[in-house]
């Protein structure tokens, strides 16, 4: 290998390393260890227009991120996987423990988590605003999602996720 090729390779590797530090690229794959969606490996893709039922990776914003971390649900910096259940213009209600979207019951909230700790509560109906999403894993009764923290900014979504390999019972 010539000196010029060696120098070019060294510069290329160095530039790639610096780019990963400076640009903080998003991960291409996410390992999900939560039972809210099937445990396994998911591929992260850029978000397009959101669709109801689409599975997305979300970086919890503050103060939610701190709440999740302090209570041992999810460390800061770890994305959570949730399904889009309502888009801007749709009406989401929590009446007692029942969650509904556009007058269709989609699931139940709980008063307490698996350790007996009280969960956040909200009540009433609200229209999802521009730049917001209602995220809820309706297939999992134990999912910590919009049942408790209501709407999230769409900007918190870091990508769509597609299963690569999952462990389903």
Language-model features and meaning:
Residues 1-79, 127, 150-169:
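Protein maturation boundaries and topogenic segments
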Residues 76-108:
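Mid-length scaffold segments of soluble, non-membrane domains
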Residues 36, 78-80, 86, 119-122:
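Residues that act as N-cap/strand-start positions at coil-to-secondary-structure junctions
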Residues 41, 51-56, 90-91, 98, 132, 138, ...:
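Structural motif
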Residues 47, 61, 97, 104, ...:
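Surface loops and adjacent helix of pleckstrin homology
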Residues 109-112, 118-161, 165-168:
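Acidic/glycine-rich C-terminal interaction modules and beta/coil loop segments
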